[in-house]
């Protein structure tokens, strides 16, 4: 989950690609079909609102002009901050004013939108209008990330994915591969230096690097930490990226057991595993760079890119520019990717579909039911998901939402530069999961986050804090009517 302060430097868009793709260079198959399909919408303008991120900028700068050229339909895409985007979209959909024909939907908010019937069923809409169903658009081509935007009961699609990435374990290949460092680590620990598979191994590596460079007087630490003491980024790091690696899923809440959060009532928010996870994470924070206590997802990325950490958990969209953009990163060519460290049995549970090992984030474009230009918007949403469009988009603003995109030669070339990140996304993305399907997402976070911040600042002991958070979660769920 990233609600604000996401990296959104528009300079990243297109510049990351070796050869920039502009609207006039984008080659679309079946151009005549698009011209014919768009002819009936002459004079129509469709409007969208989205967060200012590299993928969104590609929509406004490249896809919209190309779509206009082919169909004659004007496209206005408003890119803004997350809070402004959310505020504008939600107010429009609540009032049914039809200002926007397309809205950005973050993975973790879609369940609230579906519960309020804000979005058009795209599967049904296209089935009812075969004359505007693009011949090369296919729901079957979407990656499993699209499942986050399907209705729980009908399985139909309510949003076209436009960005998707996992939170991965990044490590410095130049440091891990340095013979002098390898020898020192071997002598100290009795084992070879390689990316950690367990939390114990990760901690050992982090402690080694922090001490190693402290002795040398250099500003390199053993790990990153997304541990801001007053921003939800830290809450999300723990519940979405750390707790699952200890086998604590869905924030430790059990919807099938009267939405229990506390161990006393059958939940796991304050379980022994959750407390062990928190103790481990706090110990890593304590040997991370000093800026970690004020770091959100953005600052973690810049810390790693500045060469100030040997390893860390980093969002995939940031991992891409860290590994490839020399104008912003000092570690280009020296970045490896791996699965996060795990407790015993967690990987096996994820492979069996009984758990997950980390966070799968991203968003989609949805069509509000109040839109007055639904058919024209349906055309554009399909256009976004064409295989030839997605190939260029994946190179310009690293993200993949179609399975066919992985096989593109351009994408494979970039995959090498990114240390195999796209291979991991393709082959092991199924082991990661988005936010729980909770319509009370924001309310529960806001109710418990203040206690979490008190843990981070040392006002409350970690174990006591988790006990208080579990009790507060159940109180909030009772007030909201979920817990009886």
What is the role of each PLM region?
Residues 65, 150, 155, 175, ...:
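Extracytoplasmic/periplasmic substrate-recognition and gating elements
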Residues 23-47, 68-69, 153-156, 210-219, ...:
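Immediate post-signal peptide segment of exported/extracytoplasmic ligand-binding proteins
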Residues 28-34, 45, 51, 335-344, ...:
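Long, aromatic- and glycine/proline-rich binding clefts that accommodate carbohydrate-like moieties
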